[in-house]
């Protein structure tokens, strides 16, 4: 059965200066709510493959593109959908993995996994669970300009009044001529 993506992708090219351009590619993949048409996880996987095709087309046209892929992926880090979007090899995207600024300043024992970092971005009331399903992914070029210390999950009082997601902030220092 062929299904249509309910939400598309938004692509925005930003000419920061005459010598610097970046592309934002945003998404909101299928929610976790069950649908009668198909399995929602499979639907997200198919949407993720379409998004990765778009990422690959950008890299084919501009191999050193300054690309940021972001949004509500409705998928955890180990899902096939997210792995498809991140990709492999030269065009693999970098996960910024933002965390709350909660005062912890000890270096993690393993830099790839920091158990003290609070990284959840979404509360799913039906399952009473907190998870990270919102992402900011970067091309290799953007990753070089990414400021880790300026990237975090915003912690606000009453955050859940307006949304079941928490905002993410990422900071970059653009290099001219890229």
Where are these regions (language model features)?
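Structured beta-strand-rich core segments of catalytic domains in phosphoester-bond hydrolases
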Residues: 1-29
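Acidic/histidine-rich helix-loop elements
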Residues: 1-2, 33-43
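Metal-dependent phosphoester-hydrolase catalytic domains
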Residues: 4, 13, 56-68, 75-178
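A surface/extracellular/periplasmic glyco- and lipid-processing/surface-interacting theme
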Residues: 15, 19, 44, 68
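Active-site metal-binding loops of divalent metal-dependent hydrolases
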Residues: 29, 72-73
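A short local loop/turn or secondary-structure capping micro-motif enriched for an aromatic residue
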Residues: 31-34, 178
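A long, amphipathic alpha-helix that forms part
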Residues: 41-63
